[in-house]
Amino acid sequence: MPTINVKKADLERLVNMPLEDEFIEEKFPMMGVEVEGIFEEDGEKIIQFSINPNRPDYLSAEGLARGFRGIIGIETGLKKYDIESSDVKLYVENVETRPYIAMALVKGVIVDDYVLESIINLQEKLHWVMGRDRKKVAIGIHDADKVKPPFYYKEVSGDGIKFVPLNSDEEMTPREILEKHEKGIKYAHLIKDDKFPIILDSEGDVLSMPPIINGELTRVTTETRNLLIDVTGTDKYAVEKTLNIIVTALAERKYGKIHAVEVIKDNQSTIYPNLKEDVLETTSEYINKVLGANLTPGTIINYLRRCRLDAQFVDNKIKVFIPAYRVDIFGEIDIAEEVAIAYGYNKFSGEYPIIGTIGELNQLEKKCDFIREIMVGFGFYEVINLMLSNDEVLFKKMRIEDNNYIEVLKPASIEHRIVRKSILPLLMETLRINKHKELPQKIFEIGDCVVIDENAETKSRVVKKIAGVIVDNETNFNEIKSYVEGLLRELKIEYELDNFEHPSFIKGRCAKILKDGKIIGYFGEIHPEVITNFELEFPVVGFELEIE
């Protein structure tokens, strides 16, 4: 889990009360934050906190103080942040590689060395927790007084512009930054097809080249009083939430005032930041059933307010208002968790379930364990991938046209929005990630896939499958056929083989596996186009088989 260091004096200033060490160590765990240690550094008392990744709003002293004021009851409810209007505009051109951007101003901040360090630390922690090391989200924080609006967000070629990157005194082109600058070298893999996102002001000065580096021109110093924040990325939800976390944290500082920026794209205007709260509904009956408690609606509402939410009891339901900087509340169960946090986990007592049976391993899992032993005996290594992926990996790279799949309604990431119906594409992606490793590579995975089934109660069905791939200099159809037949023989499955045309395999080099006339799997030589799509350079063979 990420950790942050906070000066005790600063925390006391933000909480607005003196805090004893014992009080800190007792109360912060109540809000899900571990106190890793309290120590002296350069004459200052420092507190190290360990933050759960699902609470990125706690990655700053400001966010911690806001939550702490609620949990100890000195300031409860959803905090409202005033957003002042401005005439600042950002015009967005077609930026294919990072299509989403949000921007805001925070004026009147007082930045000393510690606050400056705190801002930079928050930025870097969010790059990891929200941004997947800048791949999904990248943040730029600038001295707003050094540039002149309106601003422009567009793509340029590698030699299309020159500017001085942060921590440098030399003008460079975007391509030169990737070759010479420390950050450019580190994040060069995030730039594709010689398309470089750039943020400019009205005079053509460069603020940022996301997700690589800011310009030296807008460096934030202790003299800075007005901050301009940009957040770019591949996921709109993550971009907007990241901006909300930053501006609300900065607004916790004395004199910090949030100012809006109008973002204009395709003749449509959006005002950022959008701090409108989300709304969910629950009931006291549901909360009490989940927690095993007997709380009145009024008590539940009070507990929610201590977690810095707001709530109202309307028509026998509890309407819950969730602040715009929270990214961890999606349904009723999350509301129940908030109540449990404020109520105090230490107040819950356990009960032994009244069960008169003895558990044992599921028969299907026993079969899967047996298959694992067989595959390891064949020299394969087991891998485990996520069940969520995207159409690029599951279909486009595999040369498959398929619209019959299950998609997540509100995905946390654009890269993880489709429930897989096949394991083979994810094994190809694993080979791509490990293409620098020595050959041969033989990997397999056993796992669940989800297919649409209109006759099922949930309109879907979970299918247990095994898939395997081999990449080597000279692998071929006969090699994968021998492994598949060996596996079927060990499982004592009576089967037939027949020719099969599958877009991911070479025509005439693919076979289907039939059991009682039904297709239960297939294998063969992967199509060269698929191999190229996954950036591989050697032949690949693979198979996929239903286990149940």
Swiss-Prot record:
* Record InterPro entries: aa-tRNA-synth_II/BPL/LPL, B3/B4_tRNA-bd, DNA-bd_dom_put_sf, Phe-tRNA-ligase_IIc_bsu, Phe-tRNA-synth_IIc_bsu_arc_euk, Phe-tRNA_synthase-like_B3/B4, Phe_tRNA_ligase_beta2_arc, PheRS_beta_core
Entry's EC annotation: 6.1.1.20
Q: Where in the cell is it found?
A: Cytoplasm
GO cellular component, as recorded: phenylalanine-tRNA ligase complex
| Keywords from the named record | Aminoacyl-tRNA synthetase, ATP-binding, Cytoplasm, Ligase, Magnesium, Metal-binding, Nucleotide-binding, Protein biosynthesis
One GO BP annotation of this record: phenylalanyl-tRNA aminoacylation
B5 domain boundaries: 275-350
SMART domains, A to Z: B3_4 (SM00873), B5 (SM00874)
The UniProt annotation places Mg(2+) binding at D328, D334, E337, E338
Name any cofactors this protein relies on: Mg(2+)
Q: Please give the coiled-coil regions recorded for this protein.
A: none
Reaction catalysed?
A: tRNA(Phe) + L-phenylalanine + ATP = L-phenylalanyl-tRNA(Phe) + AMP + diphosphate + H(+)
Q: Which GO terms describe its molecular function?
A: ATP binding; magnesium ion binding; phenylalanine-tRNA ligase activity; RNA binding
Q: Which family does it belong to?
A: Belongs to the phenylalanyl-tRNA synthetase beta subunit family. Type 2 subfamily.
Indicate the quaternary assembly: Tetramer of two alpha and two beta subunits.
Q: What is this protein called?
A: Phenylalanine--tRNA ligase beta subunit
